[in-house]
Regions:
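Conserved short alpha-helical segments that host acidic/polar catalytic motifs at enzyme active sites
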Residues: 2-4, 10-141
Length: 141
């Protein structure tokens, strides 16, 4: 599947968000942030990370450039998670806002997910989930 062209680009290039995951023997958040630095050109509307701290899922998001996320992560200096995911977003659906940043949380805060692209039949899927009582938290989850 080809990534979509983004209208804000000056050149005729394809645009995708930046996605990274890490599972290893080192603390994950610094590895993920370094990866997001390398991918920031793929999206600077928002950024976010998800990781397990102890037995709790932590998702930290920020609108704007990666530096805004790094400021928020400074409040978590003792993060020792050995796995996690990260995302830089170029808004193609939904406004640039923290609520629309990835990772998205589901499953009673037991699942964090990141994706790239637009699900073409999202409206049909959303209506079905709303009918079942699901509460959406953003324009992009």
């Amino acid at each position: 599947m080809e990534p979509r062209r983004h209208s804000r680009e000056r050149k005729e290039q394809y645009c995708m968000c930046g996605i990274i995951g890490y599972a290893g023997h080192r603390p994950a958040v610094p590895v993920i942030i370094e990866g997001l630095r390398r991918l920031e050109y793929r999206g600077y509307d928002s950024a976010g990370v998800g990781f397990i701290q102890g037995r709790e899922l932590k998702v930290i998001k920020a609108e704007g450039k990666l530096a805004a996320l790094e400021e928020k992560l400074a409040h978590y200096p003792n993060t020792v998670a050995m796995n996690g995911i990260g995302h830089t977003r170029w808004a193609t659906h939904g406004v640039p806002a923290e609520r629309n940043a990835h990772p998205h949380i589901g499953g009673n805060n037991e699942l964090a997910i990141i994706h790239n692209g637009i699900i073409e039949n999202f409206q049909e899927l959303k209506e079905g989930l709303l009918a079942k009582g699901y509460v959406f938290k953003s324009e992009t989850d």
